[in-house]
Amino acid sequence: MSFVALIPARMASTRLPDKPLADIAGKPMVVRVAERAARSGATGVYIATDDARVAQAAAAHGHAALLTRADHPTGTDRLAEAVEQLGLADDTVVVNVQGDEPLIDPALVDAVAATLQASPDAAIATCACPLADAEALFNPNVVKVVCGAGGRALYFSRAPIPWARDALAGGTRVLAPGLPALHHIGLYAYRAGFLRRFPALPQGALEHYEALEQLRALEHGHAIVVHRTPQPPMAGVDTPADLERVRALYADGL
């Protein structure tokens, strides 16, 4: 299995300024992410950033970095530029490892790459796990995905889907037994050729209203295949509290 891991990293975080360079046990967070990605089967790991400080920090710790434009509207656009800089062949599998995931499981990176490689008719592979409880079902920050035959994604939503009419009658908030909904995990694999084309696809109404970029692919008829994992991954870093939690885990010898 051959694939490349790309790590988009931007400095402009409102809740945690300079997040990619936040120290975790003596190394910048983005370097910790690269270390985890390097433990997967990736043949190359590259940090794609719009800031020279991130590139310098990566190089200081022996990791490759690509300087990209600062005006990319999404991380996927940044990856598309990175694919061009690297000159990757269109059939190269590229895994997008988020730059704020210093606890990412290398085995999950391998799994999403293998899922795409086993699905030649799919444009994207991603991951999902069972919903934890009714609170997760109704939480708009927990993205739900429903799948059809062969694990193909039918829809992603912040809303509780599918709507269990009988179980939720009268305003009851429960997770109906056997509800065929999963908690989406934001780890993606693409083919380099699709990444090159993706930024040119116009945003549709579904992506606009849900604010979920992957819906653009579905709206334009591109298949997304979902790898199911039994457990949710360890949470990433969005806030100062998240950062302290991760620091404590590394201090304990993670």
UniProtKB/Swiss-Prot annotation:
Pathway: Nucleotide-sugar biosynthesis; CMP-3-deoxy-D-manno-octulosonate biosynthesis; CMP-3-deoxy-D-manno-octulosonate from 3-deoxy-D-manno-octulosonate and CTP: step 1/1; Bacterial outer membrane biogenesis; lipopolysaccharide biosynthesis. Coiled coil: none annotated. One of its GO terms (cellular component) is cytosol. GO terms for biological process: CMP-keto-3-deoxy-D-manno-octulosonic acid biosynthetic process; lipopolysaccharide biosynthetic process. It holds the Pfam family CTP_transf_3. It is found in: Cytoplasm. GO terms for molecular function: 3-deoxy-manno-octulosonate cytidylyltransferase activity. InterPro entries: Cytidylyl_trans (IPR003329), KdsB (IPR004528), Nucleotide-diphossugar_trans (IPR029044). It comes from the Bacteria. Its main location: cytoplasm. It catalyses: 3-deoxy-alpha-D-manno-oct-2-ulosonate + CTP = CMP-3-deoxy-beta-D-manno-octulosonate + diphosphate. Its EC number is 2.7.7.38. The keyword Aminoacyl-tRNA synthetase does not apply. The keyword Ubl conjugation does not apply. Gene3D superfamilies: Spore Coat Polysaccharide Biosynthesis Protein SpsA, Chain A. Keywords: Cytoplasm, Lipopolysaccharide biosynthesis, Nucleotidyltransferase, Transferase. NCBIfam families: kdsB, PRK05450.1-3, PRK05450.1-5, PRK13368.1. Activates KDO (a required 8-carbon sugar) for incorporation into bacterial lipopolysaccharide in Gram-negative bacteria. Belongs to the KdsB family. This is 3-deoxy-manno-octulosonate cytidylyltransferase.
